[in-house]
Amino acid sequence: MIKTNSVVVVGMGFIGGFLLPGYKMLLGDRVATDVSVIKATDRDLEKLRAEYPFRITVGNTLKVLREKKPDIVVMCPPPAEIPVIIKDTLVPYFNEARAAGIPLPDIYTFGPVPDPQYYYDCLGPDIHCVKYLPSMMETVGGVHLQKYGGSFLVFTPGDPFPPDRRQRAIDFSDLFGRTFIIPHDQSLYALAAKNTAHTLFEISYAVSEALEELGHNTSTANVGAAMLSLYREFMGGGRVDVCEGSLKEVPEAILPFLRGVTEAWYKGILTYIVSVGCEEGLARDFHGANFESLLCTVRLATRKELEESTANHATKGGVNEKAIEVFMACFYGPLRKAARLHMEGGTSESFYDVAEGMAYTINQTVHRHAYRLAGKF
């Protein structure tokens, strides 16, 4: 791999720390000296400094860029802050670097927006920018799920990256998921699909609560184990080597219900992805990777751990928050009620049609929300 001398990271929310394995891949034992992270405020500053090996400072991005002359700038602030950071910090630094003959850093931007083309429009055609949407799967119960979920990588049309720097960008992505290189528009509906599938967490909450109300000691992990096994049954296989499911941890009577809901949720999301123009083979590939990885997460984690993970990933106003908001408003109550009715012998097969339609509708809503976010740039 091409040598990386220095990395500057703008933003220290969850993603800034989550990328630590990537910094280590690029820099090895030089992370402490050659990764510089800049926060917007001093909130939790000392806590973060104690937790991470790299230097963390506040509000001095331009100064750090001038000092470090990085090979890579990682952009992971809230999307709304990006235009100001580009105007007040990146534009002057890139202009100074050009005038001094200093090589321009590659820009790795994280989040659904902006399109990498926005950076080219603001900074000039001689830059190199790539957008990352990592799978965000985590290590749960000692099982490393990171590389099994779908990660999306977006280069600009024409892809001006030199081959060695392009490969470095891909290698960085591969650490955090199974990489799919797709255009910006496709990345928005791929991300919407993943975040709709993320509501598998909330499905497990609703079914677990319904069973608990009926006197069954059934955790979200038990529900996840059954859904994972049932998913693999109707898909004809899966990554059993990564995480095993089980049909024996829930009351046998709930299995037909879980089978119907799991299959409906998978199909509703897939139908939406294909409806907006995605080639079905590609859609099945990345959707299946995310769906199974999320079911593995539900199977391996406690409810508290799932809720903590969601709190870390659900950016205020973002696509994950939107998926959960719509699910909770429109389907959580009906799903709990249907699970109870099924156990009492009263569920209609039509409920699964409703579930499939709801998955489609949530995906559509989240996709449109992603476009509204993109429209701000």
Task: Put a short name on every predicted segment.
Residues L19, Y52, T57-A169:
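Rossmann-like NAD(P)(H) cofactor-binding subdomain of soluble oxidoreductases
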Residues M1-N5, T33, G224-A253, G260-F377:
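NAD(P)-dependent Rossmann-like dehydrogenase/reductase catalytic/cofactor-binding core
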Residues E51, Y118-I127, L145-A301:
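Internal alpha-helical scaffold of NAD(P)-dependent oxidoreductase catalytic cores
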Residues V7, I15-P21, D44-K47, N60, ...:
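Non-catalytic structural scaffold of enzyme domains
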Residues M1-I72, L175, E209-G215, V274-S275:
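NAD(P)+-binding Rossmann beta1-loop-alpha1 motif at the extreme N-terminus of oxidoreductases
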Residues T41, P112-P114, L133-E138, Q186-L188, ...:
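Glycine-rich beta-alpha junction loops
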